[in-house]
């Protein structure tokens, strides 16, 4: 049985739709289930529903053979997993944002984010020294209350930035969800996993 870890929410919904297009027989009530572990005996699959950051942990430690994770998580975590396929779902991007017309001041201006590794790498590559402040939610609040000069966050439609009076200043990277695999699982179940990859690849919408 293949075990696949997936994040709850938008990625889960789009991934389930993709699996169905690839002719995987998932039950109609699959999306409505409140279970965190769902077995689909007909396809010899088990699904684990988790928080996005935890999906990569489950795959790295072999609790799940495969996982679906956003490229933003993979960039931030840098875990020991293989990236097999760009699923082209949950499209968004990582960006630097802030209040319009406000310049970064001081020797090491502050940047708030839940992606400290991504932010540190980006500003270092830009030749800018910054102080990173890690937050876990409501990142847009940081410039409004004077906690930070800039934020680094995921942007989808830009609506949240606009509603909080912020503007996108720099685009860091495009983000889509990826199919990842545990290296040991790939060696042991390579043939089965490759069949899954081929079926998904055949139905992925091209950008």
Swiss-Prot record:
CDD domains: PBP2_HisGs. The keyword Repeat does not apply. It catalyses: 1-(5-phospho-beta-D-ribosyl)-ATP + diphosphate = 5-phospho-alpha-D-ribose 1-diphosphate + ATP. The keyword Glycosyltransferase applies. GO terms for molecular function: ATP binding; ATP phosphoribosyltransferase activity. Pathway: Amino-acid biosynthesis; L-histidine biosynthesis; L-histidine from 5-phospho-alpha-D-ribose 1-diphosphate: step 1/9. It is an enzyme of class 2 (transferase). Keywords: Amino-acid biosynthesis, ATP-binding, Cytoplasm, Glycosyltransferase, Histidine biosynthesis, Nucleotide-binding, Transferase. Pfam families: HisG (PF01634). GO terms for cellular component: cytoplasm. It is found in: Cytoplasm. Its EC number is 2.4.2.17. It comes from the Bacteria. GO terms for biological process: L-histidine biosynthetic process. Belongs to the ATP phosphoribosyltransferase family. Short subfamily. NCBIfam families: hisG. PANTHER family: ATP PHOSPHORIBOSYLTRANSFERASE (PTHR21403:SF8), ATP PHOSPHORIBOSYLTRANSFERASE ATP-PRTASE (PTHR21403). Catalyzes the condensation of ATP and 5-phosphoribose 1-diphosphate to form N'-(5'-phosphoribosyl)-ATP (PR-ATP). Has a crucial role in the pathway because the rate of histidine biosynthesis seems to be controlled primarily by regulation of HisG enzymatic activity. Lacks the C-terminal regulatory region which is replaced by HisZ. Heteromultimer composed of HisG and HisZ subunits. HAMAP family: HisG_Short. This is ATP phosphoribosyltransferase. The gene is hisG.
């Amino acid at each position: 049985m293949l075990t696949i870890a997936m994040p709850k929410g938008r990625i889960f919904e789009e991934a389930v739709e993709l699996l169905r297009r690839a002719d995987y027989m998932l039950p109609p009530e699959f999306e409505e289930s409140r279970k965190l572990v769902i077995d689909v005996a007909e396809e010899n699959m088990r699904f684990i529903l988790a928080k996005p950051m935890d999906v990569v942990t489950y795959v790295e430690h072999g609790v799940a053979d495969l996982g679906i994770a956003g490229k933003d998580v993979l960039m931030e975590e840098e875990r020991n997993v293989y990236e097999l396929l760009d699923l082209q779902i949950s499209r968004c991007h990582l960006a630097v944002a802030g209040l319009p017309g406000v310049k970064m001041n001081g020797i090491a201006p502050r940047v708030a984010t839940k992606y400290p590794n991504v932010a540190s790498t980006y500003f270092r590559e830009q030749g800018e020294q910054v102080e990173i402040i890690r937050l876990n939610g409501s990142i847009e609040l940081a410039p409004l209350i004077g906690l930070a000069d800039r934020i680094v966050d995921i942007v989808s439609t830009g609506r949240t930035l606009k509603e909080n009076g912020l503007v996108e200043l720099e685009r860091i990277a495009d983000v889509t969800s990826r199919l990842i695999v545990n290296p040991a699982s790939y060696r042991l179940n390579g043939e089965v996993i490759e069949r899954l990859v081929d079926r998904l690849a055949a139905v992925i919408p091209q950008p």
